Regions:
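Conserved small/polar residues in nucleotide/adenosyl-binding loops
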Residues: 175-180
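Cationic, low-complexity basic patches in intrinsically disordered or flexible, solvent-exposed regions
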Residues: 184
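Membrane-interface helix-loop-helix modules in multi-pass inner-membrane proteins
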Residues: 51-108, 135
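The cytoplasmic-loop to transmembrane-helix boundary for the fourth helix
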Residues: 112-124
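Membrane-entry segments of alpha-helical transmembrane domains in multi-pass membrane proteins
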Residues: 2-19, 37-45, 76-92, 115-118, ...
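C-terminal ends of transmembrane alpha-helices
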Residues: 1, 57-71, 100-104, 121-148, ...
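Hydrophobic cores of alpha-helical transmembrane segments in multi-pass inner/ER membrane proteins
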Residues: 15-26, 86-100, 155-168
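Membrane helical hairpin/interfacial module
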Residues: 6-68
Length: 185
């Protein structure tokens, strides 16, 4: 019986996309909430968000099977389906992240970093809500289950993204301190 149509690859893809949304927390704190302490950490946050998003989308593309199915998926839209909306949400998030990274790293357009950050923050909330809604509509037969999964995905995004970012920064610091210790001795 095919009550749940997604398998383990889809779960990993959605997890990576949720982490991509959440790992942007540090950049959001620096630009949206104007916390100067987080400014040096923000570009890494946005780059990691892009990397996790591309990883999750690569898993979804591999699940399509033949390469010609990707062309069909990109050119044929059913706008009544939330899956079609997610194509725009995912590609839009990638584009917004590229612009956001550009505004953070280029001094000539640095003044646009805050508006780009606010737009990226809003877009990622919509993206995570859409992803949570898909799961809600697929697995919930009762109305209360559908409504609670979108906020749950936002919470998971905030938690998983922050933890993954912390672990990556911690690993980088451990690696660089080991390299610095090796050079000193």
């Amino acid at each position: 019986n095919n009550q749940i149509v997604w398998g383990l690859p889809h779960i990993f893809a959605v997890l990576l996309i949720v982490i991509a949304s959440g790992v942007l927390n540090i950049a959001s704190i620096s630009s949206v909430f104007d916390k100067k302490l987080y400014k040096p950490l923000a570009p890494l946050s946005a780059l990691l968000a892009m990397a996790f998003l591309i990883s999750g989308l690569a898993i979804l593309v591999l699940d399509l099977g033949r390469p010609d199915r990707l062309i069909v998926a990109m050119t044929t839209y059913n706008f009544k389906s939330i899956f079609a909306w997610n194509i725009f949400l995912y590609s839009g998030f990638a584009g917004i992240l590229a612009i956001y990274i550009w505004t953070m790293l280029d001094r000539n357009v640095k003044k646009f970093s805050r508006p780009a950050g606010i737009f990226a923050f809003t877009w990622r909330i919509v993206l995570t809500t859409g992803t949570g809604s898909i799961f809600g509509f697929l697995i919930s037969r009762e109305a209360y289950g559908t409504a609670i999964l979108a906020p749950l995905f936002i919470i998971m995004s905030l938690l998983y993204g922050t933890v993954v970012y912390f672990l990556i920064v911690k690993a980088c610091l451990l690696y660089t301190s080991d390299a610095a210790d090796d050079q000193c001795c």
